[in-house]
Every structure is written in C-alpha cells, then in structure tokens.
Amino acid sequence: YSDKDGNLFDPHNGKKDLENGKVNFIGLTDKRIKEDFLRILRYLRFFSNYSKQPHDPEVIKKLKMNIQGISKLSKERLLDELKKIAKIETLQNLSKDKISLEIILLIFPELKNIKIFSKLNKSNKNFLKRNDFIFLISLMIVDETDNVDYFLYKFNISTKNKKRIKNIDNFYKEKISSKTFNQNNINKYFYYYGREATLDILNFKLIKLNKVDKSLKELVKYYENKEALIMPVKAEFLMQKYEIPEGKLIGEKLKRIEEMWVKNDFKISDQEVDSIVNN
C-alpha cells in the first residue's frame, strides 16, 4: 500500500513476489482463508493468471484443510467468483495445472468437462475468447447425466439462461447420428428454438470436436445470417377461405398444417392445405 505522498510500504515483500510471479497470501495463510473462504477460489484465479512459480506446498495444505469452509458461502458469491474464473486464458491455465484442477473440482464437482480447455486448438480458443459465461459453463457441465439439472438447481441462474443451457443439454442427450447435423434437420431446430439455440448446438459440437470441420463451420455462418422461418398459413386465412369458426378446431388445423409444412422442408401446397382442412 502507499501513503498520500505515494511512498510504498511493503511489509510482506508483495512487490518482489509480483515481480517473480509468485502468488501468495498476505499475512498468515490459514488466518486469511478463515476470514473469507472465497479466498480459496481467488487464489486459484490469481495463480492461473499471474503465477510463474509452482504452488507453495504449505499454501496448498492450508487450502485443502479449509475446503469445507466453502459450504458456508452463499451460492451467489460462489457463482460470481466462478464468472471471474470463466475467462478462456484463466480456464486454460487452470485446467493444465493438476493441483488447481483438483481443488476447483472439490468446490464445483459439476464442472466435469473443464479439462476441455487444456487442449484447445487456436481457432476454438479465439472463438471462445469472444463467448459468454453461459456458453462456457455449458461446455463444462453438459454430459449424458443429470449433471446440468443439479448445477441449475444449486445455483441461481436466470430463467432465460437456464433455458439456454437446457436446450444444449437436451439436444445432446438425444442420439447423435450422421444425419443430426444435416441442414434439413437443423432447419427444424432453427424454426422451433431460434438462432441463438441453433448456433449454441453447432458451436458446442465444433468445440467438442476440437478440429476444423468445414461443413459445421458453413452451417454456423449460414444460421448467423438466416432469416427467421415464418409459417405462411395464418388463422385469419383459414377463417376467411374455409369459413372455419374461431376456436379449438382452427387451432388443430393450424397445428397439422404447420407439421406438414415443417416435414416438407418448410413448403406446403394449396392442395395439401385443402386436404388437411377438409379432413
């Protein structure tokens, strides 16, 4: 710290540690951790971002001895700190460090796929630098189990972001085949779930593959610019042309027309509409 005249006071040699890339606690490690158990996570973040030295074994010993104190922290504070950790450079360094990885998984066991960041190719790394917390979290928690549900139950995430994560989770819980990512199939997903959800499932696949896939990249570019698909037949049209009264029947007819339109790659003829309405 410095006084009002700018004179530096450094009783713990912090300046020297900073110059040497050594991350340590100011004062007694055990005492500082017990003052605020969130400092365990902050240590991991600072170590991942600034350290040029290996962990001090005594520091790690104190971190592990106090790990149960994390349970005393609010979920909001834990999530806020996780958001600060969820930067691509931090995640990459953390996931490559065995000790840091072990500790963060004790605190956030739901981050099952965090090691994905240890081996990113250049293209994926550059892409993820531009991405947001929700997509990064999805990469870490989506698997074939109920892991996502547990994470969303445990932490207070907005309804909108919960839906976004669940869209990715639900998509990849289905059986993935060679036809999953053809344009006809993705068009249907785009229609029902929208642009953001479609780009999420495509980019998720690209990151998991961790290699250049030209067809997937072309799909991403296509759906970044694709206009929304709008069903051409409306209730007013059916009421006027076919004299169908407003109510349950018109809803049923519209649903069947929509299903036919989607099935036919978003095309439907007048004859097909006639057939559905008159049967």
Where are these regions (language model features)?
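Glycine- and charge-enriched loop/helix tracts that form the active or gating conduit
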Residues: 1-148, 153, 248-249, 253, ...
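C-terminal subdomains that position terminal phosphate/3'-OH groups for nucleotidyl transfer/ligation
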Residues: 100-279
